[in-house]
Amino acid sequence: MASVAKARSPKSTQSNSLVYDLLVLSRFTKYNPLFTIFAGGMFLFVASFPTTAFSCLLAGSTLVGNGSDVTLTWVFRQTALCLSACYSFCGAGMVWNDWIDRDIDANVARTKDRPLASGRVTTTQAMLWMVFQMAVSWWLLHFMLDGKDVNNHMLPVVIGSFLYPFGKRPICSKFYFYPQYILGFTIAWPAVPGRTAIFHGQETFAESVQACMPLLNMVFFWTIFLNTAYSYQDVVDDRKMGVNSFYNVLGKHVHLLLCLLLVPVAVCVPMYLNQFHSTWLWVSWAGVWALSLLRQITRFDEKNPASGGSLHVDNFLLGAWTVVACTIELLMRYYS
């Protein structure tokens, strides 16, 4: 029996290694996919985690309480379905991005050890894993929305995720088109299914999109801000290889660019929160975001590209806190 176990151990080890590499490929070993669920379960998309969470929880807060038939259990169930769908789709998008970028990643110090760039995962394995995650995401959305308008919610992010890695190519810079545009859209979009998860029987798809516009715009510019700061870590290698990125717009004036990106965020947050008439949200969301983003912009040092990495962590914590704030708002509305 011992000899049989020994004979099987290399294959078992190889299988475990592949499973781990697939999880790494989808960034499931990191917090990155959680950005996609912030806006929607407020559906992201999170950038994404916060986007989804923000949209779904606050939509639910407008319906609970005052004798309403809408229960906390149902709102939390819809939010969980939204978050799971976003998380799974984000993982699929990461696989596609790394497959397209595998040759570029192999020549960048920070990314050369990624599963596809290093050859630990084959193209066939990666594509099967990607399709599986997309199928799971579609099924979860179908279940959450009772089969209504599922393709309307999926198609925009499918197209965006497909185009995103191509936006990094040098030819796109000639048209002033940068991958951060697509990333911002795909992370912001989950706000729509997040709201629809709650209102799908009460408003049309177009009405849900319109209601989410302030949140969509806020998350769009917030995502470009945090991704520009984070990607700036690779500025030296990216410029050597001619990688197209948003921080090349103003060259050495990246700090000014980041400040400008926060202007629409500062405008859209009040526009979105105004509909809820909640002092708690003004303090816990608008107030905390103002202090955090001001702190981030003062800490960023364009002469030290590594400083962008810490901003990524700060924004994840900011999104996570806002999910907590939205949950508290929901509970206060329900028990008031």
UniProtKB/Swiss-Prot annotation:
It comes from Apiospora sacchari (Arthrinium sacchari). The keyword Transmembrane applies. One of its GO terms (cellular component) is plasma membrane. Pfam families: UbiA (PF01040). This is Polyprenyl transferase dpasC. InterPro entries: Prenyltransferase, UbiA_prenyltransferase, UbiA_prenylTrfase_CS, UbiA_sf. Keywords: Glycoprotein, Membrane, Transferase, Transmembrane, Transmembrane helix. PROSITE patterns: UBIA. The keyword Transcription does not apply. GO terms for biological process: terpenoid biosynthetic process. It is found in: Membrane. It is a multi-pass membrane protein. Pathway: Secondary metabolite biosynthesis; terpenoid biosynthesis. Its cofactor is Mg(2+). The chain crosses the membrane at residues 34-54, 80-100, 125-145, 181-201, 205-225, 253-273, 274-294, 311-331. CDD domains: PT_UbiA_COQ2. Polyprenyl transferase; part of the gene cluster that mediates the biosynthesis of the diterpenoid pyrones subglutinols A and B. The first step of the pathway is the synthesis of the alpha-pyrone moiety by the polyketide synthase dpasA via condensation of one acetyl-CoA starter unit with 3 malonyl-CoA units and 2 methylations. The alpha-pyrone is then combined with geranylgeranyl pyrophosphate (GGPP) formed by the GGPP synthase dpasD through the action of the prenyltransferase dpasC to yield a linear alpha-pyrone diterpenoid. Its EC number is 2.5.1.-.
